[in-house]
């Protein structure tokens, strides 16, 4: 369940900014039918930063209910205060989720020792599998391979989403962890190369709109059919890149609406609607991918 194409699913909202259950059901049904390995609910792409804690928990539980054991659900549970991250994680004990995706603390920029102690404390307060999440472009701090190696020895820490896009990280981390430590790319554009170097899959933004293609690409890569996987990847490459033409999840939420997967592309401030130029850029990438 922690391999292949795992979607960082958007959180669909109605025009008033309330979570839209009907659209979330449609999205989850789409991923079940498309072969997506698992869903990450309320991660970065799911707008964790603009949901309060009760809403955050409610959306994860809604996703679990709608998934109805057809597809595993992973909860985003990161925070920049350790006690807050522990509290959020503990909300999901015995809930039915299969694990947590826990981002590095943002804004306060802890040291490597601070990062180690943060993740260690979370893991010690739950039995849920923990996936570390390193995305320094958003958080302002970088979880270095040496620290990952230390954390890999902590009970319940089972893998990492590595979103630097730096492919040298794969081998650097692999040298410091056991073979069963899960390495997931957090960068769609380099995910196939990441897998060819020994990664196990991707937590994907692109999969929101190209679920079947991403699942097939990851399946081919896992079977060693990299030439065939690369054909799919090249068709998706403009989409991998252009879904970040404006801050995530603005473009991907609009793309979901354009494909009829959600009813609206409503976001909460400070996220604002996609611009006209952004819309045309993403539409062209969707056409190149054969999705329009």
UniProtKB/Swiss-Prot annotation:
The keyword Cytoplasm applies. It catalyses: L-aspartate 4-semialdehyde + pyruvate = (2S,4S)-4-hydroxy-2,3,4,5-tetrahydrodipicolinate + H2O + H(+). GO terms for molecular function: 4-hydroxy-tetrahydrodipicolinate synthase activity. One of its GO terms (biological process) is diaminopimelate biosynthetic process. Its EC number is 4.3.3.7. Its main location: cytoplasm. Keywords: Amino-acid biosynthesis, Cytoplasm, Diaminopimelate biosynthesis, Lyase, Lysine biosynthesis, Schiff base. The active site is at residues 133, 161. It is found in: Cytoplasm. Disulfide bonds: none annotated. The record marks 44, 107 as: Part of a proton relay during catalysis. It is an enzyme of class 4 (lyase). One of its GO terms (cellular component) is cytosol. Pathway: Amino-acid biosynthesis; L-lysine biosynthesis via DAP pathway; (S)-tetrahydrodipicolinate from L-aspartate: step 3/4. Pyruvate binds at residues 45, 203. HAMAP family: DapA. Belongs to the DapA family. Catalyzes the condensation of (S)-aspartate-beta-semialdehyde [(S)-ASA] and pyruvate to 4-hydroxy-tetrahydrodipicolinate (HTPA). NCBIfam families: dapA. Homotetramer; dimer of dimers. This is 4-hydroxy-tetrahydrodipicolinate synthase. It comes from Shigella flexneri serotype 5b (strain 8401).
């Amino acid at each position: 369940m922690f391999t292949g194409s795992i979607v960082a699913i958007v959180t669909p909202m109605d025009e008033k900014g309330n979570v839209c259950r009907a659209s979330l059901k449609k999205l989850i049904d789409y991923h079940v039918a498309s072969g997506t390995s698992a869903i990450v609910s309320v991660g970065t792409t799911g707008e964790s930063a603009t949901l309060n804690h009760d809403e955050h928990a409610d959306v994860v539980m809604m996703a679990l209910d709608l998934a109805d054991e057809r597809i595993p659900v992973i909860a985003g549970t990161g925070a920049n205060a350790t006690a807050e991250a522990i509290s959020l994680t503990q909300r999901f004990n015995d809930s039915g989720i299969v694990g947590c995706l826990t981002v590095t603390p943002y804004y306060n920029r802890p040291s490597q020792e601070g990062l180690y102690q943060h993740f260690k404390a979370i893991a010690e307060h739950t039995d849920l599998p923990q996936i570390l999440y390193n995305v320094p472009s958003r958080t302002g701090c970088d979880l270095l391979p040496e620290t990952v190696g230390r954390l890999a020895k902590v009970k319940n820490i089972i893998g990492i989403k590595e979103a630097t896009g730096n492919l040298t990280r794969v081998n650097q981390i692999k040298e410091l962890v056991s073979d069963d430590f899960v390495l997931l790319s957090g960068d769609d554009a380099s995910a196939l190369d990441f897998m060819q170097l020994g990664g196990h899959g991707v937590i994907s933004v692109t999969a929101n709109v190209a679920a079947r293609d991403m699942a097939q690409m990851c399946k081919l890569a896992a079977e060693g059919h990299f030439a065939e996987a690369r054909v799919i990847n090249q068709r998706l490459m403009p989409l991998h890149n252009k879904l970040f033409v404006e801050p995530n999840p603005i473009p991907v939420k609009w793309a979901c609406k354009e494909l009829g997967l959600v009813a609206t592309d409503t976001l909460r401030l400070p996220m604002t609607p996609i611009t006209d130029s952004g819309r045309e850029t993403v539409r062209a990438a969707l056409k190149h991918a054969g999705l329009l």
